[in-house]
Amino acid sequence: MSRYRGPRFKKIRRLGALPGLTNKSPRAIRDLRNQSRSEYRIRLEEKQKLRFHYGLTEKQLINYVRIARKAKGSTGKVLLQLLEMRLDNILFRLGMASTIPAARQLVNHRHVLVNGRLVDRPSYRCKPRDIIMPKNTTKSGVLVQNSLQLFTGKELATHLNLFSTPYKGLVNKIVDTNWIGLKINELLVVEYYSRQT
């Protein structure tokens, strides 16, 4: 199954606000109380929220769940930490891109340096003390500057620092899962995959 490239607003109406997918918000969420929702459907919707927000394929999400299961600690929290520390998500949280798909495009088009080295993989896992900045070209600088102008006034994540002289971001620590701006029950996602295998 490939990455979703269809109408984004349909997904937002179905699953609720997904800030990583688009910066629009749904007008009115349909009343789903009359419909009977099975446990499977609830788990599936939570999994789909996570998948569409971060722009992952099904296979990528399965791999992240496997890695999270092997790690110490709560599988759900480790899963969210792994997803939040992806390079495309860090660029989105820093405000260098308006959405996660826009951040993926920045990375794929080779506009981003991590610790002074060119990185062209959106799934690159950032670590604490990583420095993320646009490439030293005018085109890269303009793209990031335009996104940062739209970002002004929004709250920056506690695990990140943004410096404006040369535009660069610093990852201070691993993200705290309480800060994530997505209403999701990560345990239902883990349950969904534990029942699949």
Curated annotation (Swiss-Prot):
GO terms for molecular function: rRNA binding; structural constituent of ribosome. It is found in: Plastid. Keywords: Plastid, Ribonucleoprotein, Ribosomal protein, RNA-binding, rRNA-binding. InterPro entries: Ribosomal_uS4, Ribosomal_uS4_bac-type, Ribosomal_uS4_CS, Ribosomal_uS4_N, S4_RNA-bd, S4_RNA-bd_sf. Residues 85-157 form the S4 RNA-binding domain. SMART domains: Ribosomal_S4, S4. It holds the Pfam family Ribosomal_S4. GO terms for biological process: ribosomal small subunit biogenesis; translation. One of its GO terms (cellular component) is plastid. Belongs to the universal ribosomal protein uS4 family. One of the primary rRNA binding proteins, it binds directly to 16S rRNA where it nucleates assembly of the body of the 30S subunit. Part of the 30S ribosomal subunit. Contacts protein S5. The interaction surface between S4 and S5 is involved in control of translational fidelity. HAMAP family: Ribosomal_uS4_B. This is Small ribosomal subunit protein uS4c. The lineage of its organism: Eukaryota, Viridiplantae, Streptophyta, Embryophyta, Tracheophyta. The gene is rps4.
